[in-house]
Curated annotation (Swiss-Prot):
Homology family: Belongs to the AccD/PCCB family.
Pathway participation: Lipid metabolism; malonyl-CoA biosynthesis; malonyl-CoA from acetyl-CoA: step 1/1
Protein name: Acetyl-coenzyme A carboxylase carboxyl transferase subunit beta
Organism: Sinorhizobium fredii (strain NBRC 101917 / NGR234)
One Pfam family recorded for the sequence: Carboxyl_trans
Gene name linked to the record: accD
Reactions mediated catalytically: N(6)-carboxybiotinyl-L-lysyl-[protein] + acetyl-CoA = N(6)-biotinyl-L-lysyl-[protein] + malonyl-CoA
């Protein structure tokens, strides 16, 4: 009896018992409820196959997907004061930083790289939304400024991929200072005669929208991205009016002239290369031949 109890029964229980399944093994589409295996989602650039819904894409995955062959030079993360205000809400700010670093394996929300996109050299700056909501603080602001300086030194364009809830409240006025600082960096790039492209991703809101996210020479946006300053619910409560359907989406902004193009994630590298070749004054026919696309598909502002 002991042999059955101590050996056979545990074996049967282990074979038939419920197995632990990682929580992130299957990912649910927020639009249709479709369940997608995480590896399939990663291979499809974090786009739901059936619905076409664009999920949030990790910063490093975006850089690897963007640059030719996934090869790029990672720009160093500048060091700044960690918690000068000694801020605490329901949790210490230092604890939030520690948890976000463990979750994302990043020092802060900004990841920047230098590489080639279909032969065009550029600096790309990407927000990691999973790091405290992609919020803009001192470290992020300094990283963005260094990226603009790198682009100027390399005499190449800069492409920004914002995904943020806005300024980081745990840093107070020190966070808000990054709005004018990054705006100055944008102006320096433009004074150098170099293009600045913004690819608006979901979500782009708050102070990030009020600064460098809306200062591009060309604004692209991913489908269905939420783009705005204040949230839709806050605006409705303030105005006491119901807002139009699709308000603050990339498609709505395209219709009202705030966005130049809505581009699917799979088409972004080719579109960026085509736009940049034109802005860098490369012959139009050469740009058309290399991209294999019709330059006439660009908006009038981009062709001017």
């Amino acid at each position: 009896m002991n042999w059955i109890t101590n050996y056979v029964r545990p074996k049967i229980n282990s074979m038939l018992g419920r197995r632990e399944v990682p929580e992130n093994l299957w990912i649910k589409c927020p639009e249709t409820g479709e369940m997608v295996f995480h590896r399939d989602l990663e291979e499809n650039k974090w786009v739901i196959p059936q619905s076409g819904h664009h999920m949030k894409m990790p910063a490093r995955a975006r850089l690897k997907d963007l640059f030719d062959g996934g090869i790029y030079e990672t720009l160093p993360q500048p060091k700044v004061a960690q918690d000068p205000l000694k801020f605490r809400d329901s949790k210490k700010y230092l604890d939030r930083l520690r948890d976000s670093r463990a979750k994302t394996e990043l020092e802060d929300t900004i990841v920047a790289g230098l590489g080639l996109v279909q032969g065009v050299k550029l600096v790309a700056v990407v927000h990691e939304f999973n790091f405290i909501g992609g919020s803009l603080g001192m470290a992020a602001g300094e990283a963005i400024i260094r990226a603009f300086e790198k682009a100027i030194a390399e005499k190449c364009p800069l492409v920004m991929f914002p995904a943020s809830g806005g300024a980081r409240m745990q840093e107070g006025i020190l966070s808000l200072m990054q709005l004018p600082r990054t705006t100055v960096a944008v102006n320096l790039l433009k004074e150098a005669g170099l293009p600045y492209i913004v690819v608006l991703t979901n979500p782009t809101t708050g102070g990030v929208t009020a600064s460098y996210a809306m200062l591009g020479d060309i604004h692209l946006a991913e489908p269905g991205a939420e783009i705005g300053f204040a949230g839709k619910r806050v605006i409705e409560q303030t105005l006491r009016e119901k807002l139009p359907d699709g308000f603050q989406t990339s498609e709505y902004l395209l219709e009202h002239g705030m966005v130049d193009m809505v581009v699917k994630r799979h088409d972004l590298p080719a579109t960026l290369a085509r736009v940049l070749k034109i802005l860098m004054k490369k012959p139009v026919e050469a740009a058309r031949r290399e991209s294999g696309s019709q330059v006439s598909a660009l908006p009038v502002a981009a062709r001017a």
